[in-house]
Amino acid sequence: MTNIEDKDWSRSEGDSWDIVSSVGFTALGVAAARAVENREADPLVRDPYAEHFVRAAGEPHLIGLLDSSEPKPPNPGTAPRHIGLRSKFFDEFFINATNSGCKQAVILAAGLDVRAHRLPWPAGTKVFELDQPQVLEFKDRVLAEHDATPTSDRREIAVDLRDDWPAALLAAGFDPEVPTAWSAEGLIIYLPSAAQDLLFERVVALSAPGSQVAVEATRGRPDIAKWGEMQKKYADEGHPMSKVDITTLFYDEERADVAEWLAARGWKVQGSHALELAAAYGVEIPELPEDVVEVVKQGNYVTAVLPS
């Protein structure tokens, strides 16, 4: 078994990772959260493969989380069912976008989500999944072991999003003349500010009129020190997130506000934080401590449409 306490959690220029190290571990943690969400009486997301990924990775803390009689979400210090809310937001985005004219979808930093397999895509929809080579290799191996069949024309692109991913995307059959649904979920905080700017410049350059974007972002510069304090405060002994400081993976830099950046380039933008999503989805959230509410409201789930 691989143990997260034995990993190096520092970042460096051009760093890479597998599914149980660095940024890759966050994808595994999110898969664990989706597996926990699956057990809700009325789950916000149904992901039949999430638990398979966690068990195949062999990370003992996350496996213990799933085997607990009362599993806790892997992200203490956030709104309860946060990953369920986040997953539903992006699920609904893709369903609505592809049913309103987007013929292809690009999932930037796809991680271990299996939207290409579990969403009801319109016939012929191309779904491009971009992520680190070792992450996609692990994902494909587990999916093959469980005879998973995509509900879309799935195309995996093993590439670092700090490199020339547009060339790889075009080589895989992406058509920049066709409206596209783009997503950046759990991504931009792990990018340097300059890399974030370049990412969205490339998205805009590749987007035909009618394209849509969904982004997990923040309102203003996130207080990463505060996030670290919250993690320590609410992760009890034995919780996976008590073993590592996930904020060491973030880039604490001044960066463009994604919603404002897209709006300045002619996109029609909307945004919500997780508590607003919960209200929209009819999810009752218990009263939260003030410091948790403050952090949750820093989040911004952005959707943007490029007018035709």
Swiss-Prot record:
Source taxon at top rank: Bacteria
Stretches assigned to coiled coil: none
EC number: 2.1.1.-
Keyword annotations from UniProtKB, A to Z: Methyltransferase, S-adenosyl-L-methionine, Transferase
GO biological process, one term: methylation
Tagged with keyword Metal-binding: no
InterPro entries: Ppm1/Ppm2/Tcmp, SAM-dependent_MTases_sf, SAM_mthyl_Trfase_ML2640-like
Protein name: Putative S-adenosyl-L-methionine-dependent methyltransferase MAB_4584c
List of residues binding S-adenosyl-L-methionine: 131, 160-161
Species: Mycobacteroides abscessus (strain ATCC 19977 / DSM 44196 / CCUG 20993 / CIP 104536 / JCM 13569 / NCTC 13031 / TMC 1543 / L948) (Mycobacterium abscessus)
Job of this protein: Exhibits S-adenosyl-L-methionine-dependent methyltransferase activity.
Keyword S-adenosyl-L-methionine: yes
MF (Gene Ontology): methyltransferase activity
Family, per entry: Belongs to the UPF0677 family.
